[in-house]
Structures are given as C-alpha cells and as structure tokens.
Regions:
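Beta-lactam-recognizing serine transpeptidase/beta-lactamase-like catalytic domain environment
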Residues: 1-221
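Short beta-strands and strand-coil junctions in structured, solvent-facing domains, enriched
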Residues: 225-226
Length: 232
C-alpha cells in the first residue's frame, strides 16, 4: 500500500471532493517521502494513505487494533470509542479520520494501542498493578497478565518504532529529544466540537528506549495557547 520512499507533495492542503482540508503548515511541506510525511505530521500524506486504503480496509484496521472495543483496564467506568458507522464513512470522513479526527478514543485506549503496536505487535491489556511488596520493599507477589495474538507483524512493529524515533530526533517531536537517550514519539492535534469555536487538544505520546520500549507516557493539553498547537 505504501513504502517509506513513496513520494508525496504537500501544498498546504488536500482537496477531497468539495472540501479543502488544510495541513498544519499553511505553506505546505512541498516534496517529501512517506517517512518525512510522518516526521512532519503532514495531513495530506495521511489523507492520501487513508484514501488508498479505502473505508472498508481502514475500518478493519480499527477492529484489528482493538479500537472498537474497551481495553478492559481494571478500573470501572471505562468509556467506549465513538466512531462513524462504516456505512456513513464517505471520502471526506475517511480523509479526516486518517489524520486522527472525526472519532474519539480514550487516552488509555490510545496508550494501549500504541503499546501493542510498538512492543512487537502483541495486544496488551492495561493494568495498574505489577507486583506487591512487604514493608521492607521485598516483592511478595508478582501479577502475571496474558497478551493476545499479534495485531501487526514484528517487522511492521520495528518499522513503526523507527519512524517514531525519527519524529523525535528530526521531526515535530524534536523538543522532547534528550541527549544520550533513544526516544520515539508522535505529536498530535485534534479539533474539538463545535469546529466554529476553533479550539484544539494537543498531545504528545513518547516511549523509550525507541528500539525496545520499556516505558510510555502520554501528555494531553486541552485548548493550548500559542501559535503551535502540537506539543512535545
């Protein structure tokens, strides 16, 4: 469907049917390959990929990644994903879904899904307990949790880790780079409803080490102030 060296052109927007959907860089990123599109968080690149996949295939990936079901985190009251009925996904809806808008997932779901993709491709269930210690700090019980079947291949997982490391070392997430550490991550900006309010949510998800993740963190800022709406 796409290779890292596939070429794209970003003039600052993408025309889909009768809509002009903007990139965050008004003047556009110009010529770029797919890897650079990820690093630049370029909407037209994500839109083009979504249109190549088509709504049926895209929706199937939502199912494959577990995004249409709850994570079963061990806390009550978990909210479910809000997503279009597949029958109602036209070209414009698919275009906006492809760069992370027009649907809603919880922060726990986002962290869970990314963890599952970058850990080699095995779906995990988030938990709040790893082990129990006594008053001296000695482990007296270690909880063991099952992982499920792979949602992506090991090769795909490796490629995603590599791309997200470049986001931090060279792309929109470079403010989160720390000398001596290998970090992967992704910036994100989503517009809230109603769109006429012109309000956004900025977020950054990071993990380390980039080649063998052991820790992942997610920062979310509601209605950030300033000219840059992505965060790192």
């Amino acid at each position: 469907m796409v290779s890292l060296k596939d070429r794209f052109h970003c003039p600052g927007y993408k025309i889909v049917e009768d809509r002009r959907i903007r990139c965050h860089k008004v003047g556009g990123h110009g010529a770029e390959d797919f890897a650079q599109g990820i690093m630049n968080s370029c909407n037209p690149v994500f839109i083009e990929l979504g249109l190549r996949l088509g709504s049926e295939k895209y929706y199937s990936y939502f199912k494959q990644f577990g995004l249409l079901q709850k994570t079963n985190v061990d806390l009550p009251g978990e909210a479910a994903t809000i997503m279009h009925n597949p029958k109602n996904i036209g070209q414009v809806e698919l275009a906006t879904i492809s760069f992370g808008q027009s649907f809603q997932i919880t922060p726990v779901q986002l962290a869970t899904t990314v963890s599952s993709i970058i850990n080699g491709g095995n779906r995990v269930t988030p938990h709040f307990g790893a082990y129990v210690t006594d008053e001296k700090g000695k482990k007296v019980k270690t909880f063991k949790y099952e992982t499920t079947e792979g949602i992506v291949s090991e090769k795909t997982s490796e490629t995603v880790r590599m791309l997200l490391e470049k986001v931090v070392s060279e792309g929109t997430g470079k403010n989160s780079a720390i000398k001596g550490f290998s970090i992967g991550g992704k910036t994100a900006t989503s517009q809230t409803l109603p769109r006429s309010a012109n309000k956004y949510i900025a977020s950054f998800l990071g993990f380390a080490p980039a080649d063998d993740p052991k820790v992942l963190g997610l920062v979310i800022i509601n209605d950030p102030k300033g000219c840059l709406l992505y965060t790192s």
